[in-house]
Amino acid sequence: MTYALITGASKGIGKEIAFELAKRGNNILIIARDEKLLAAAADEIKLKYSVDCQFLALDLADPNSVDKTLVWCQENKFTVNILVNNAGYGLSGSFLNHDMLAYQNMMQVNMATPLSLILKFVPLLRQQPKSYILNIASSAAYQAVPGLAIYAASKSFVLSMSRGIRYELRDTSISVTAVNPGATDTNFASRADIKSEKAIRAAEKLNMNAETVAKMAVDGMYAGKAEVVTGVINKIGAILTVILPKSILERGAGSLYGV
């Protein structure tokens, strides 16, 4: 029996990806910080889709969380054939507003933990006849974003990492896909403490439903795509990052986020 392992799956895009994968008959492993939300999601998945769903409450900012995840899977004989690196968050405003510890925690969750999970699980994924790594990046990965500068940089890392390891794993059973959502109806803005009314209003106009984003992500993963950009507006935005001068893009983002 195989499982899909999804991080940051207690709510938002991660939770919807767990539901989408369960809908397609996958057994599910979900990881996040909030044990109550995880338990509720696991119960709902088992009841709704008649698949197994187990959860582990962990803070993925803890460098030891990856080893704990691997031990949990090994002790319970959970065979993982899908790894979804979804957990992540942002810090908004001037980059000087936050200290190094705050950035280290964010970079651990957004960058180091996904890479560490990949390093730990690739040897196991290679044992499966077909397996997948799905990394959730962001439309912010395509450019510098003043006001979300370090977050955007962390998502550029995820995108570049995904494409690089995809190529290196091209002759294996593992397919790697990066997904770049734009504004999505989740708690990202409140967690990032975005205060710019202009940015909040823009996001509200462009917000995609998390369920729709999750379906696009899973469709892209199973189709073996290298990269998925969710929604027409975000696709246009990605094209503009290639066409327009970087200075114009950065000025626009800075104006949007009030820095």
Regions found by a protein language model. Give the residues of each.
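Conserved glycine-rich cofactor-binding loop
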Residues: 10-12
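C-terminal helical subdomain
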Residues: 178, 200-238
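Residue(s) in the substrate-gating loop at a strand-loop-helix junction
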Residues: 138
